[in-house]
Amino acid sequence: MSVLGELDLLGPRAHGAACGEAVLKAVAEDFQVDEVLEIPLSGEGEHLWLWVEKRGLNTEEAARRLGRAAGVQQKNVSYAGLKDRQALTRQWFSLHLPGKADPDLGAAEGADLRILRCTRHSRKLQRGAHAANGFTLRLTGLRAERAPLDARLERIAADGVPNYFGLQRFGHGGGNLVDARSCAEQDLLPANRNLRSRFLSAGRSYLFNRLLAERVAEGSWNRAAVGDLLAFTDSRSFFLAGEEECRDARLAALDLHPTGPLWGEGDPPSGAGVLDRELALAGREPALCRWLAKAGMAHERRILRLPIQGLAWHYPEPDVLQLEFVLPAGCFATVVVREILDLVPTGQTENPCAY
């Protein structure tokens, strides 16, 4: 099986060649993620919400440990999104405990998992319920000239970056996409729910990345065209762009963005030449598109441009760059880093990342 690389799975950079190189994730503390949840918790109800810190542990394993310790089935453990294994992450989980007292969760805790807070709420935590993720990244072994590096950081803070799905979505060497293609060609869906979700996500993400790569290559990823579907940063709704919408000041302010397709049933609802481009993509990947539609995936949209909120940086040591920023839920910190630096292999992970 051929191994798929970064350009196969993502696409070209928008801001030019990397300014240098560094190591990310030499240790878990080099990649810290804090889930941002904008839900007021009532303090009462049949769902126990847990604010959990984990190190070197993926979200699914943390959920299994919490479920075992609480004595509940896995279907009664919920979380908003997956977080990277090779990282220090803090995120919410909820346990459905109707008519039950708070359980002793000590058996779930250890050096790699700590429960920082517990509270009750009337509803379970839904997938995708978090508003954003806050990142603190420590890039070590830095080899780059300071002036062009600072200039690049200022540029991406002002202009954003292409909102690619990161390599983590596709598995080691693109293995999840290879498996998705195999399923599509055989018209099969895995019986295992986690595998099914992983393969469908990989196929859908690949199609989006291919469309975004085309627009990055021609320089239109951050500009609205007539026929584009536009969306605000934190909204899943979208509207068709005419000439007036293409002049909306909120595009320049990075509040409003052109979108690309997350493939599902039916043709994309885009218009004019944008629809032609998206249908041409479907024509190059007919099996994958049919498979996604048959799986019952609804056609959705994703913003092409990723605004970076609160980007700050400093150099705690001459060869260390520390970045802090916030991204909308579902977006990848690694696609921000790739517009700045090349990552050397040491310390990189093959495990699912924050989304």
Swiss-Prot record:
Q: Which reaction does it catalyse?
A: uridine(13) in tRNA = pseudouridine(13) in tRNA
State the Gene Ontology terms under molecular function.
pseudouridine synthase activity; RNA binding; tRNA pseudouridine(13) synthase activity
Q: What class of enzyme is it?
A: isomerase
Q: Keywords on this record?
A: Isomerase, tRNA processing
Give the E.C. number(s): 5.4.99.27
List of catalytic residues: 84
> One biological process GO term for this chain?
pseudouridine synthesis
Q: Which PROSITE patterns does this one have?
A: TRUD (PS50984), UPF0024 (PS01268)
The record lists the membrane-crossing segments as none
Can you give the residue ranges of the TRUD domain? 160-306
Identify one Pfam family in the record.
Answer: TruD
Q: What highest taxon heads this organism's lineage?
A: Bacteria
Q: Name one GO cellular component term.
A: cytosol
- Role description: Responsible for synthesis of pseudouridine from uracil-13 in transfer RNAs.
Family as reported in the entry's similarity comment:
Belongs to the pseudouridine synthase TruD family.
Q: What is this protein called?
A: tRNA pseudouridine synthase D
Tell me which species this is from: Pseudomonas aeruginosa (strain ATCC 15692 / DSM 22644 / CIP 104116 / JCM 14847 / LMG 12228 / 1C / PRS 101 / PAO1)
Its organism's taxonomic lineage begins at: Bacteria, Pseudomonadati, Pseudomonadota, Gammaproteobacteria, Pseudomonadales
Name of the coding gene: truD
